[in-house]
Structure formats: structure tokens, C-alpha cells
């Protein structure tokens, strides 16, 4: 969905149709899962992203962990129908260990029985209390964001909403974890998520001397 909406690919693939763009190996298409990390590039609102798609299955967690060392930000995708699972907590601890700023996308919200409020309560309890829904209106999430920082909270009490730069700083410091809800299959909430990425990610400052890190 990210690559399709950003115009990087012209055709929207589906895992269950065995034609997902980044599932290039026959075994991946056959089993409907990602086994090997893949790379793609896309642009949204003048921000250029390099996407590293990693396995979500517990059997291939070593492949995922190797990729973490080169990430500036992470996007943790959670099934809205399943909620936080044991492997979700394992990935969360790995992201914490590596100090990687993290966005969350809660997928499959089109399925019956999914409830955003219940999921948010679970995310706050199971992962971090600084998980905040960014699928709500700005005014509704402002208080939750302000609670992540004392000075922001004081400004919020006086009527000032958190600035975009304030939010970006909290994210990179891992003091705020934006949560977006939607359905990748139906492209619901994906555009909002892309807008959030473009608004709140910051390009790290790299040394002038060339350097590289091999992750696979």
C-alpha cells in the first residue's frame, strides 16, 4: 500500500494473491510471508524514504534483528484482530534495545470485532504508555502528547497545542510512539500514516567522511 499510494509501483499487490511486490522469492509467495529482508524506495510529500521490509514471523526473527542496526526509524505493524502477541513484545524489546524511534500501524481494522479504543488500552499496557493514537483529531490527541513532556503539558494547560517540531523531537527520543489505524488491503488510513511519516521523521546528521554498514 505504501509503494502504491506513493506512486513507486503502478499495481497494488496482495499477499493472498501471491503477487506482493517485495515478496520476490517463490517460497515467500507460496507461504504468504516475508522470509528475507527487502529494500524499496518511495517519495511522499517531498520526503524520500528507503523502506526495509523485514520478516514478521517469529521463525525469521534473526533476519529482522540484523536489519535493525541500519534503521533510522521503525514501523511496527500489528494486526488489529490479533492485538499484541508474544512476538510483538519481542520485537518491541529489540527496538528498545537498539534505541530506534518507532511508529505503529495497526492493520486489519476493517475486520469484524476490532475496536480502536480497546487496542489503544492494550498498546499502552503491553508496550508503552507513550503510545498515542494519531488517527484521532489533533485536539483529541494533543493532551496525550502533552503528557509525554512536562513543558509541553504546561503549555497545553495554557491553551497551546504541541508543535510539529515538538512531536518530532519526542518521537526521535522514544518518548512518544505514534499509532495509526487502518486497513492496508483497503488502503484505509495508509495516506494518513504516510502524511504522519513525512511530517514527523527527521533525517539524521551523518559525518562528512564516507561510511557504510552492511546488514545482509
Place the predicted regions along the sequence by residue.
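Structural and coupling elements of P-loop NTPases
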Residues: 1-216
